[in-house]
């Protein structure tokens, strides 16, 4: 259970990184530099900071691809977990559970699995108290 929560947190972190807005490119920075003529030292520092953001674009590309792979694997795992939960919870055959899960969207599958594990974690926490 602990590993599942840690994996879920990592997936959420990668999602935030992958969906962040793109940084300004070096070409756009050159245009800003020409327009503003950099009279102030503070402006020079600001533009220098923005020039470093081009490295972030490369990192975001790496994490974006990694995020897609992780998300795909997480979806497959959640699909399998949803089938197991339905078999255990509803007492139906594996084929019937698979048919029900196939009819659900990815979002519904995620919510179903997270709801199940959330209730399970809440029960364990209340037992310890």
UniProtKB/Swiss-Prot annotation:
Q: Return the Pfam families for the record.
A: Latarcin
Localization annotation: Secreted
Keyword annotations for this protein, in alphabetical order, are: Antibiotic, Antimicrobial, Cytolysis, Hemolysis, Secreted, Signal, Toxin
Q: How is it modified after translation?
A: Cleavage of the propeptide depends on the processing quadruplet motif (XXXR, with at least one of X being E).
- The residues forming the signal peptide are 1-20
Name the tissues where it is expressed: Expressed by the venom gland.
Primary localization: secreted
| Annotated InterPro entries | Latarcin_precursor
Propeptide segments, given as residue ranges: 21-60
Q: Which cysteines are joined by disulfide bonds?
A: none
This entry's Gene Ontology molecular function terms read:
toxin activity
* One biological process term in Gene Ontology: killing of cells of another organism
| Domain remarks in the Swiss-Prot or TrEMBL record | Both the N-terminus (61-94) and the C-terminus (99-129) of the mature peptide form alpha-helices which probably disrupt target cell membranes. The linker region (95-98) probably derives from a processing quadruplet motif (PQM), found in propeptides of many zodatoxins, hinting at a fusion of two originally separate membrane-active peptides.
Role played: Insecticidal, cytolytic and antimicrobial peptide. Forms voltage-dependent, ion-permeable channels in membranes. At high concentration causes cell membrane lysis.
Record family assignment = Belongs to the cationic peptide 06 (cytoinsectotoxin) family.
Q: What is this protein called?
A: M-zodatoxin-Lt8c
Recorded source organism is Lachesana tarabaevi
The gene name reads cit 1-3
């Amino acid at each position: 259970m602990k590993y599942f929560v840690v994996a879920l947190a990592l997936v959420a972190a990668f999602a935030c990184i992958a969906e962040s807005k793109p940084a300004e490119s070096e070409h756009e920075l050159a245009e800003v530099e020409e327009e503003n003529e950099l009279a102030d030292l503070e402006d020079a520092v600001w533009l220098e900071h923005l020039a470093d953001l081009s490295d972030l674009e490369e990192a975001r590309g790496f994490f974006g691809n990694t995020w897609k792979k992780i998300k795909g694997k997480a979806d497959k795992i959640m699909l399998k977990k949803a089938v197991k939960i339905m078999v255990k919870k509803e007492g139906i055959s594996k084929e019937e559970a698979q048919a029900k899960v196939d009819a659900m969207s990815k979002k519904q599958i995620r919510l179903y699995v997270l709801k199940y594990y959330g209730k399970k974690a809440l029960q364990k926490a209340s037992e310890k108290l």
